[in-house]
Amino acid sequence: MKIVKILGGLGNQMFQYALYLSLQESFPKERVALDLSCFNGYHLHNGFELERIFSLTAQKASAAAIMRIAYYYPNYLLWRIGKRLLPRRKTMCLESSTFRYDESVLTREGDRYFDGYWQDERYFLACREKVLKAFTFPAFKRTENLSLLRKLDKNSVAIHVRRGDYIGNQLYQGICDFDYYRAAIEKMCTYVTPSMFCIFSNDIAWCQTHLQPYLKAPVIYVTWNTGTESYRDMQLMSCCAHNIIANSSFSWWGAWLNQNSAKVVIAPKRWLNMDNCQFPLPASWVKI
């Protein structure tokens, strides 16, 4: 049996679910299930979102099944404590602290429990079409989203700026700063002539002050998708022709799900402020 732990915001959940799909492909005769137990008492983001957004159905591992190959934690707090105190079991496949790609993940026989973020498309490239199908968004209903969708053309550019919870966080701050976005906008303009920019951010005021002078095309600030409808921003990003992303799994997926065969994606070459960390981006993406 293979069990994949799901935890985090929407982008992280999507990476973990993509691994789940890939394991199903690699081990068709084994049962593959999800461990959702840590969402109990987890108050960050919007909880487990994959079923609500994508209507996905997946086998959920029972407490007994989890205890057989790992440790069962009935809530998020106990997991935070237990992961520091309890020894790693041989059946537990923990992602490297440097997030290095591990090709053995998809070939490990027998019972395995997968705990990590798995933010590397190589973990699921072999079942790319299956992942794309799983992450098919529901149709837009809100007037503002439908109106913007009609305006998007072959030269529309999505820019995702994540500040808010990143400000003051030593792990993330200082990577996608003003200099990054200025360089990314300039670089994008060497590939295409933008017809419009769509700005997605949790700090629109900062974008208006710092980025507006460099945007030489009409700008739309997308501010209306909030709370449990926040995923609509990712959906709109994927509908734009081109993407400038942040060091965020949310905008990574917005760009990856973009099906424009001629898309230009500009991304930060560094993802975290950690030594020896590896975050391989798709080869076709432009890294700065």
Regions found by a protein language model. Give the residues of each.
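Donor-binding and catalytic core of enzymes assembling or modifying cell-surface/extracellular glycoconjugates
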Residues: 10, 186-275
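A short, glycine/small-residue-rich beta-strand->loop->alpha-helix junction that serves as a flexible
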Residues: 5-15, 41, 45
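Leloir-type glycosyltransferase catalytic cores
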Residues: 273-288
